[in-house]
Amino acid sequence: MTFENRNNRKTLTGKVVSAQKTQKTIIVEVDRYKKHLLYGKRFKKTKRYAVHDEAQVAKVNDMVMIMETRPLSKTKHFRLYQVLSTASDVEKEAK
């Protein structure tokens, strides 16, 4: 695989909703906004992805970027690419 093809992989941004329950796996919720074909109203679709976290750095409520990869198990087809913001950063901004 060339380096150019590696950059064409799908990347998604979402929130970690489950971590440290299974080794090296986190669950990330990704929100997408779609438009109804007939009525035109926008609505939110949420999908949960099982993501491989080799270093186990992601915690619950972290915002992360995930990247598509080869199938690692029956449900894991994404890996952790980058932690965008941690849960403690989000709490500090809220106060």
Swiss-Prot record:
Q: Which UniProt keywords apply?
A: Ribonucleoprotein, Ribosomal protein, RNA-binding, rRNA-binding
Q: Which Pfam families match?
A: Ribosomal_S17
This protein's source sits in the domain of life called: Bacteria
| This protein's record includes keyword Ribonucleoprotein | yes
Record keyword Ribonucleoprotein present: yes
Output the Gene Ontology cellular-component terms: cytosolic small ribosomal subunit
Name the InterPro entries for this protein. NA-bd_OB-fold (IPR012340), Ribosomal_uS17 (IPR000266), Ribosomal_uS17_bact/chlr (IPR019984)
Family under the similarity heading: Belongs to the universal ribosomal protein uS17 family.
Q: Which PANTHER family match?
A: 40S RIBOSOMAL PROTEIN S11 FAMILY MEMBER, SMALL RIBOSOMAL SUBUNIT PROTEIN US17M
Q: What does this protein do?
A: One of the primary rRNA binding proteins, it binds specifically to the 5'-end of 16S ribosomal RNA.
- Which protein are we looking at? Small ribosomal subunit protein uS17
Q: Which organism is it from?
A: Mycoplasmopsis synoviae (strain 53) (Mycoplasma synoviae)
